[in-house]
Amino acid sequence: MSIKQMPGRVLISLLLSVTGLLSGCASHNENASLLAKKQAQNISQNLPIKSAGYTLVLAQSSGTTVKMTIISEAGTQTTQTPDAFLTSYQRQMCADPTVKLMITEGINYSITINDTRTGNQYQRKLDRTTCGIVKA
């Protein structure tokens, strides 16, 4: 049956259902965006955070993503390579109950290390897959 052949009430019901579904998706994304913004603000209140020769200097949100920028401390010998530090940091974040909850709610994390010694940039994304979170 084509749309032209559908009775008026069925078509209206179908359109209302689709509109409701799309509104639900938009509402979920809006909520996730607000959560990401709040999470970035909470992290920012505690900056800078130093660990193993690296410093977390910036946290900001972009849509449903919390973007965090870490720099290697100039003139300081780091105890880990940037990749090793990111792997360790990823493990810690994925184990954190608050981060797990945020990821379950649709928040993703993007972590960037700017290595001031080499000028290289290293990046990791944290989401359901990278943290091994099964969708409920």
From Swiss-Prot:
Disulfide bonds: none annotated. Induction: By heat shock (shift from 30 to 45 degrees Celsius) (at protein level). It is found in: Cell outer membrane. In many other E.coli strains this gene is part of a type II secretion system, but in MG1655 the locus is missing a number of genes. The gene is yghG. One of its GO terms (cellular component) is cell outer membrane. Residues 1-24 form the signal peptide. A lipid is attached at C25 (N-palmitoyl cysteine). Belongs to the GspS/AspS pilotin family. The lineage of its organism: Bacteria, Pseudomonadati, Pseudomonadota, Gammaproteobacteria, Enterobacterales. A lipid is attached at C25 (S-diacylglycerol cysteine). This is Lipoprotein YghG. GO terms for biological process: DNA damage response. Involved in a type II secretion system (T2SS, formerly general secretion pathway, GSP) for the export of folded proteins across the outer membrane. In a functional T2SS this subunit helps assemble the outer membrane channel. It is a lipid-anchor. Keywords: Cell outer membrane, Lipoprotein, Membrane, Palmitate, Signal, Stress response. It comes from the Bacteria.
